[in-house]
C-alpha cells in the first residue's frame, strides 16, 4: 500500500512528459520521408549498377 502513491505520481509524471517537446524544431530539421526517399533512390541506383555492370559496362555511370 505504501508503493501505490509513488506509483501514481510516477505514472502522472510519465504521462505528462510525453506531450513536452524535448527539442524545439529548427530550420535544419528534415522530414523523415526525405531520408527514406534518398535511401530508396540510392539503393535502386546501386542495385542497377550491380545488376547491369557485369553484362554491359556502359550503364555503370
From Swiss-Prot:
Q: Which positions does the record annotate as the modified residue 4-carboxyglutamate?
A: 57
State the Gene Ontology terms under molecular function. Answer: toxin activity
Q: Does the keyword Disulfide bond apply?
A: yes
User: Which keywords label this protein?
Assistant: Cleavage on pair of basic residues, Disulfide bond, Gamma-carboxyglutamic acid, Secreted, Signal, Toxin
The UniProt PTM text for this protein says: Contains 2 disulfide bonds that can be either 'C1-C3, C2-C4' or 'C1-C4, C2-C3', since these disulfide connectivities have been observed for conotoxins with cysteine framework V (for examples, see AC P0DQQ7 and AC P81755).
| Pfam families documented for this protein | Chi-conotoxin (PF16981)
Q: Has UniProt tagged this entry with the keyword Signal?
A: yes
Give the record's GO CC terms: extracellular region
Source domain of life: Eukaryota
> Cellular location of this protein?
Secreted
Q: In which tissues is it expressed?
A: Expressed by the venom duct.
Q: Where is the signal peptide?
A: 1-19
- Which residue numbers fall in the propeptide? 20-47
Similarity annotation: Belongs to the conotoxin T superfamily.
Q: What is stated about domains?
A: The cysteine framework is V (CC-CC).
From the Swiss-Prot or TrEMBL record, give the protein name. Answer: Conotoxin TeAr154
Identify the taxonomic lineage of the organism of origin.
Eukaryota, Metazoa, Spiralia, Lophotrochozoa, Mollusca
